[in-house]
From Swiss-Prot:
Coiled coil: none annotated. The keyword Mitochondrion does not apply. The lineage of its organism: Eukaryota, Metazoa, Chordata, Craniata, Vertebrata. It comes from Homo sapiens. Residues 1-115 are annotated as: Sufficient for interaction with NIPBL. One of its GO terms (molecular function) is cohesin loader activity. This is MAU2 chromatid cohesion factor homolog. It comes from the Eukaryota. The gene is MAU2.
Amino acid sequence: MAAQAAAAAQAAAAQAAQAEAADSWYLALLGFAEHFRTSSPPKIRLCVHCLQAVFPFKPPQRIEARTHLQLGSVLYHHTKNSEQARSHLEKAWLISQQIPQFEDVKFEAASLLSELYCQENSVDAAKPLLRKAIQISQQTPYWHCRLLFQLAQLHTLEKDLVSACDLLGVGAEYARVVGSEYTRALFLLSKGMLLLMERKLQEVHPLLTLCGQIVENWQGNPIQKESLRVFFLVLQVTHYLDAGQVKSVKPCLKQLQQCIQTISTLHDDEILPSNPADLFHWLPKEHMCVLVYLVTVMHSMQAGYLEKAQKYTDKALMQLEKLKMLDCSPILSSFQVILLEHIIMCRLVTGHKATALQEISQVCQLCQQSPRLFSNHAAQLHTLLGLYCVSVNCMDNAEAQFTTALRLTNHQELWAFIVTNLASVYIREGNRHQEVLYSLLERINPDHSFPVSSHCLRAAAFYVRGLFSFFQGRYNEAKRFLRETLKMSNAEDLNRLTACSLVLLGHIFYVLGNHRESNNMVVPAMQLASKIPDMSVQLWSSALLRDLNKACGNAMDAHEAAQMHQNFSQQLLQDHIEACSLPEHNLITWTDGPPPVQFQAQNGPNTSLASLL
C-alpha cells in the first residue's frame, strides 16, 4: 500500500510539474507576444511568431481557442492579411462553441469575425453568425446586448432600418428584463435615431417622451447619466433642425450646451457598474464635444448667424485634428465632412468662394479614403458643387451638378433643397427650361402638397415661387408669396430668407414706382444682410439703395450707396477670379463616379462675371 501511495504521489508530482512547465512555456510565449505587440513601434511579425509557437505544444482546447482568437485579432487589427485573420477567427469560434463556460472567447470571436466578414463585403456570412451568437448568448447580458447592437448596426449600414429598429426593440426589452435601465435607454435612443432617419415622427414622439423619463429617473454613474442626456438632447435638437424650426430649438440647444459643459467638468473615472449589461458607453466625452459643436454649427447656419457658425466650426475642426492623431474611428471623418459641408455653404454666402472650393476639394479627399463615406455624402458633395457653380455664374454646370445630386439621393429634405435651388437656376436662365421648371415648381408647391415637413424649406419654396412670379412680371402674386416667406421666416428667425424676401419685395416696389415702400424693405434687408453677413444680398441692396436715392433726388445718399456697391462688387469680383483660377475649379465638370484624384491647373477663369457687376 505504501509503495502504491508513493508511486501515486510521484505520478501526481510529475503531472503537476508537467502542468507547471506547460503553464510556464505558455505564459512565456504569451508574455513575449504581448511585449512585441505593445513595443513602439509594434513588432507584429514577432508577436505573431510567438503566438504561432503555441500550437506545436498541442495545448488544451481552451488555450488553442484563445490563441486562435489572439492571432486573428492581431492579424485583423495590425496587418492586411485578412485571409489568415479569418482562418484563425473561424477556428476560435468553432472550437470555443464546444467548451462550456467560455463566453468571452466565444463571443469576441463571433463579433470580430462578423466585423471582418463585413469588411470583405461578405455581409451574408456575418448575419447568420451574429444571429447564432445572439441566440446562444442570452445568459451573458453584456455580450447579448453588444451583439444585438452590432447586428442592428449592420442592418443600418445596409439601410434596412426596419430590421435594425426591430433588433433595438428586442434589446430594449431584454435590458429591461435584466434590470439595466441605462442600456434600455441606449437601445431606445438608438431606435429613436433610426425612426427620425425614416421620418416616422408619430412613433418618435412617444419614444422620446419615454426616453426622457428613463434618463431623468436613472440613478447611476454621473458621466453615464449625462451622456444619456446628451444623446437624448442631440436627437431633440436634430429633430427640430430637420423640421426647420430654428427658433423653437433654442431651449433644447441651450440645455445640450450646458450638459456638455457639465460632462467636461466630471472626473473621468473608469466606469465599473455592478450590472454587466451596463458596460456600454454611447460616445467618448471628446466625441460628444465635437458633436455638440456640430449641431450648434447646423443651428447657426440655418438661422443665418454665419460668423458664429465659423467660430464653432474652427473649434470643432481643431478638436477633430487632435483626436484623429490618436483615434482612427470612422465617426470622426463623418463629423469632419458634415462640418465642412456646413461651413462651405457659409463661405459661399459670405463671399469666400475660393476657400469654399478648397474645402469642397478637402471633402473629396476624405471621401476618396472611404467608399462608405462617399456613398453617404455623394449627393451632398454634388449639391455643394452646384451651389458653387451658381455663385460663379456657371449655370449649365450648376444644372448638371444638381441633376446628379437628385439622382444620388433618397433623402426627402435634401431632395427638396436641391429642387428649390435647381428651380432658381432655371428661373435665372429665362425661357430655356420652361416645361421642366413648371414641373419642378409643381412638385415643391408650398400651397398644396409640399413633400417635406421642414418649415425652413417650405418658406424657401414660397420665396422661389415669388422669384418666379417676379421674373414673369406678376408682381401682386410675387408679393403674396414673399409675404408668406416673411411670415414663416420671422416666426422661426430664418434671417437669410428674411433678408432675401425683403430685398426682392423692395425691388418689386421700386419697379412699381412705390419708392417709399421700397425703401422700407431695402434698408432692413441691408442691415440684416450686414449682420449675417450675406454678400450677394448686400450687393443687391446697395444697388437698389443707389437707384432709389437717385430717383428720390438724394444725391449724397445715392453716392454713398454707389460707393458701397462698388466695394462689394470689387470684393466679389476678386474672389470670383481667384476661385475660377484654382485647379480645383475643374471639379465643376465632375458628374459621375468617385471624386477625381487630382486637378489640372487652368490658364485662368472661363466664366462670365456679368452677373456680379
